[in-house]
Amino acid sequence: MATLFTVARPSSLLYVSSINPSKTFSPSISLKLNSLSFSFGYRPKPLRFSKIRSSLPSESESESDLDASAVTDEWGEKPGDANEPDSQPDNVTVNVITDEWGEKSGPELEESGTRFMESDPPRNEDEWGGEIGGETEADAGNGSAVSDPTWELKRCLADSVYGTELGFKAGSEVRAEVLELVNQLEALNPTPAPLENPELLDGNWVLLYTAFSELIPLLAAGSTPLLKVKSISQSIDTNNLIIDNSTTLSSPFADFSFSATASFEVRSPSRIEVSFKEGTLKPPVIKSSVDLPESVGVFGQQISLSLLKQSLNPLQDVAANISRALSGQPPLKLPFPGNRGSSWLLTTYLDKDLRISRGDGGLFVLAREGSSLLEL
């Protein structure tokens, strides 16, 4: 460094002391007001360095020293809490859950294997606290659960046909609704081969609804003021291959019943060929008392029948005598001519409560006698 301040012709203002190479060179400058001079002095200043320690462990440090060093987070706290247990059971797994900020939530203990062995299974409850699909649900009279979708469809079908006089008074909207429900039930048919399940097919079936055009005159007669269609039913006997259709008409004075007996042949597991043989007209059942309504509707006008009812009371004894006389008479049988009584019947839905059949362009919805569907 001394060579930087050496000049060929030193000025008298510049005084350079002799330089000892063995000493540390430290320049100093002094400025006087009268003259400008530079002086260089040798003031050794030892260099001091702060102690630098590497963050990496040296080979001399043992593993125990590394384990003893504490690692802290940004708040100066240790991640391991002193209150946490030192060890966990063998059958317990600790799940550390962090939130969206990276902070730990409370650990959840999950037992392996038999966590729910001693606890009850979770209950499936609705918003009112009731179990869904449990054993506590109310069952229908036929043993079907109310929440069963098939039972709900059957209940809706029974509600839709109620008050339609077996379909005679059903409007276009009701007919469309009934047809839609029938299609849904047919898609869920639990018995695709009804003729192979006689325990379900056999028995007495009560008509709920029909769209069969040949029954319209009969249903129209039941819409008269003093005559009602009391019931239309069908009895099936697969052992003897016999079907019996029965109709009962009710009047204030008597009940009239007639039936049609047919034999059938099995064409497929769900279809039969029906051949009607004869019709039977049973003797009327005379009522012990005249059962007149209070009024009847004729052309939109309500006509009172109270006076007629009072005048017929003396005739009740005569009606009882006629009933006893006719009760012992045999039924009148009428054969069907030719093949006019032939038809076919296809069962598209069958269970222990409901049967849906189609035949000759007609639709028949029937409920088993004694079913809860008849009470809806």
UniProtKB/Swiss-Prot annotation:
Residue stretches of biased makeup (Polar residues): 85-96
Cellular compartments annotated: Plastid, Chloroplast, Plastoglobule
Pfam families documented for this protein: PAP_fibrillin
UniProt keyword terms in alphabetical order: Chloroplast, Plastid, Transit peptide
Top-level taxon in the UniProt lineage: Eukaryota
UniProt feature, compositional bias: Basic and acidic residues: 117-126
A single cellular component GO annotation: thylakoid
Region (Disordered): 54-146
Main localisation: plastid
Residue range of the transit peptide in the UniProt record, numbered on this chain: 1-53
InterPro entries found in the cross-reference section: PAP (IPR039633), PAP/fibrillin_dom (IPR006843)
Note: Simultaneous down-regulation of PAP1, PAP2 and PAP3 leads to impaired long-term acclimation to environmental constraint, namely photooxidative stress imposed by high light combined with cold.
Family: Belongs to the PAP/fibrillin family.
Function: Probably involved in light/cold stress-related jasmonate (JA) biosynthesis.
Protein name, per record: Probable plastid-lipid-associated protein 3, chloroplastic
Species: Arabidopsis thaliana
Annotated gene: PAP3
